[in-house]
Amino acid sequence: MDMIDKQYKYLLLDLDGTITDSMEGITRSVQYALGHFGIDVTDLNSLRPFIGPPLKDSFRDYYGFTDEKAEAALSKYREYFATKGLFENRVYEGMDAFLASQLNKERKLYVATSKPEVFARQILEHFKLDGYFTYIGGSTLDGSRSSKTDVIRYVMDVNGLDDNQAVVMIGDRKHDMVGAGNNGIDAIGVLYGYGDEEELRSAGASYIAASVEDLEAMLT
C-alpha cells in the first residue's frame, strides 16, 4: 500500500470497477451487441477489456469496427443494458462504509465515469449510494463528452474545483490515470477492479490501493 502525504478535499471516483463490480452487466450487454453482428462470444471473461474505456473505442479496437458500425453496436449494447445489464451489478464490499467515512472526514465526493450520466445516476440510486455524492458526472448519450479526460474536466468545471492540489481521481483503469494527469490532478489506482498495477503505474498513477480497506487507510 502506498502512503499519501497530501490532504485531499475532493475525491472523484470512477464507477465501474471502483464503486461497483459491473462485469456481468457490461459483458452481457457487449455479448448481446456483438451477437447482432453475427459474432458469438460465449466466454464473458474475454470481454472484460470493455469495462472502463469508452465503448465505441473498444468496439473499434477489439473487433475492428468502423465508426458507423461501432455506433450501431453501441445502440444495441444500450438496448440490453438499459433494461437488464444496468442491474447485473454489485457494490464492492466495504464501499458503502468507505464513502460514509470520507464524508465524516469532511471530504466531498464526486462521480466521474465514462458511463452515460443517466445510467450512472440510475445505478447509484438503485444501490442507495447517490446520497453520498455532491455530483454525479458521466458521458453524454450523443458522444459529445465521452473521454475520461473530458468527463473529469466537466465535473471539475461544474463544481468549481479549481485547486488541483486538493483533488484526486480514484479509478481502476489507465483511462482514469491518464484523464487525471491531463487535468493536472493526482490519481489513485485501485487493484480490486479491472486493471492491474503495471497498467495503472505506466499510465501515471500517483498511488496504488490493493483494496477498499487500503483506500480507507491511505485517505486518513
Which functions belong to the PLM regions below?
Residues 2-49, 63:
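Active-site neighborhood of HAD-like aspartate-dependent phosphohydrolases
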Residues 10, 148-177:
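Conserved Lys-Pro-Asp/Glu-containing loop-to-beta segment of HAD-superfamily phosphomonoesterases
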Residues 30, 98-124:
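Substrate-recognition element of Asp-dependent hydrolases with the DxDx(T/V) motif
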Residues 33-34, 54-67, 123-126, 155-157:
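Helix-loop "lid/cap" segments that line or gate small-molecule binding pockets
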Residues 40, 130-134, 162, 206-209:
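Conserved H-loop
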Residues 60-100, 105, 165:
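Metal-dependent phosphoesterase signature
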Residues 130-145:
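A short, structured active-site edge motif that brings together acidic residues
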Residues 169-209:
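Acidic, Mg2+-coordinating phosphoryl-transfer loop and its flanking beta/alpha structural elements
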